Amino acid sequence: MVPLWLLLLFHVIHFSHGNEIDSAASNGSALSYHYGKLYLPDDHIPYYLHSNRHIAALCRRDPHCPFKQHLQNLNSCWGYEKSCTKGHGYSYPVCDQVDFGWAKTIEESQEVFWKQADFGYVKERLAETQILCRPQEQGDSMLACSRNLQHCRATNLYLDLRNPRRGQENFKEDFLQEGEIGGRCNLDKQALLSQGAWKSPLQSWFAELQSYSSLTFKPVEDAHCDIIIDKPTYFMKLDAGVNMYHHFCDFVNLYITQHVNNSFSTDINIVMWTTSVYGYGDLFSDTWKAFTDYDITHLKAYDNKRVCFKDAVFALLPRMRYGLFYNTPLISNCHGSGLFRAFSQHVLHRLNITQQLPKEAKIRITILVRSTEFRKILNLDELVHALEAEPTFQVKVVDYKYRVLGFLEQLEITHNSDIFIGMHGAGLTHLLFLPDWAVVFELYNCEDERCYLDLARLRGIRYMTWENRDKVFPQDKGHHPNLGEHPKFTNYAFDVEEFLRLVRQAAKNVSRHSKWPFRRTRDEL
């Protein structure tokens, strides 16, 4: 007989509502509704069906299943599944040369990159998951976590917030005490407490789960809950919601968490875990629509109550050690993470952002300008006029002010750009949503050389930056309020001819890319 805890673990890992599928099998309309709720990019369907063979079996029997054409490709896999065979994975990174600090061969380099920043990262998180609190009978709870509590899954979770210790801190370490979080299960307390080496607010769930307790009652069945949450719930600790680079570390890790749990349902609750009394400023809130059908819940909404969650996930965090993508130590000379490309496709699909090609084979250039005090382009008009004189260029200048241009409108512009130009800054995170053939041109990196170069490598698009230091002209040496002279705290002018040379090179890279839609009808710029 299979142990109960193993069955429950299987249920938590496969977060995909098997009961809904079973009940739908006898109801044609319900079955169709389920298919519609999946709402994945068409290219992702066979990968999903590979890991969800029960859905594939239903589809095979159902004459109205819209996924029939994908049933021929069930060998297709993301790469982290145990059933995934070589050659059938979603993609594999490209390495141009060996980084001998990490590997000895090109093949080893590819494997390193795949594990650092691709679906191999998901595979490692799955492999290191261990059960810390085992259920003994039906109705019991369970807690299973990856190494250092970077990600956890729980069933029948009890959370007692009748005595909330809220203040100004976002992540108060002693917010929960013994008995205020836990479940009825056999807890290996020593194993739990051994996972605290990486304790830090945005790197681990240790502070929140170190007081997880083995309870004497079944939280849900024994009526110890003021509120019972039936829907799967994802707890998230969020980075800065006003900075696209930092906030998209949240969204990327939420997407990775969905892969770890084999569930892409939007019929979930997302709870923002914070111990602060304050709200959360979010300039990119439209993005949540790609992950949930509901508004984000602040943890304080449950204050003064005992809340029980039947299924809960503590999501991967935005600043984890060796995580993605804020603290990623990335091997050099490799690029093209299938995980990041899939994330881009997933978000664009669910937010209904589409590619709208021009009638003529022109290179669409978007220049992102800044309305902040520093890192402005002093001779912007001169550069724009020079580009507009080129008959093959279509130029747009944008300022992504959230009060003027909504985030979905911003994404529409970005995704329909072939060359995206901007000064160093969080706005360049938009490169995640450029088409595959695009080039991102960080006009000047302000001596922060790796940030957007590495992000472009993850996304798998070409990156360029200013090359000749003698042809860029800072307004002054920069004046950081505390650090003194600093290249990020001034403005710049650029040599026009050198600028044109670089943009023309970027345009050649676009036109020669195998996926550029006009490649076959255009021989040269």
UniProtKB/Swiss-Prot annotation:
Motif (Prevents secretion from ER): 522-525
GO biological process terms held by the UniProt record: protein O-linked glycosylation
This protein's UniProt keywords: Endoplasmic reticulum, Glycoprotein, Glycosyltransferase, Signal, Transferase
GO MF assignments: protein O-acetylglucosaminyltransferase activity
Cell compartments where the protein resides: Endoplasmic reticulum lumen
Main location (coarse class): endoplasmic reticulum
Entry EC no(s): 2.4.1.255
Gene Ontology CC, one term: endoplasmic reticulum lumen
Top class in the EC scheme: transferase
Alphabetical list of InterPro entries matching this protein: Glyco_transf_61_cat, Glycosyltransferase_61
Pfam families per UniProt: Glyco_transf_61
UniProt signal peptide: 1-18
Catalytic activity: L-seryl-[protein] + UDP-N-acetyl-alpha-D-glucosamine = 3-O-(N-acetyl-beta-D-glucosaminyl)-L-seryl-[protein] + UDP + H(+); L-threonyl-[protein] + UDP-N-acetyl-alpha-D-glucosamine = 3-O-(N-acetyl-beta-D-glucosaminyl)-L-threonyl-[protein] + UDP + H(+)
Motif (Required for optimal activity): 293-295
Glycosylation sites per record: 352
Ranges that cross the membrane: none
Family, as annotated: Belongs to the glycosyltransferase 61 family.
Function, as annotated: Catalyzes the transfer of a single N-acetylglucosamine from UDP-GlcNAc to a serine or threonine residue in extracellular proteins resulting in their modification with a beta-linked N-acetylglucosamine (O-GlcNAc). Specifically glycosylates the Thr residue located between the fifth and sixth conserved cysteines of folded EGF-like domains.
Protein name: EGF domain-specific O-linked N-acetylglucosamine transferase
Lineage: Eukaryota, Metazoa, Chordata, Craniata, Vertebrata
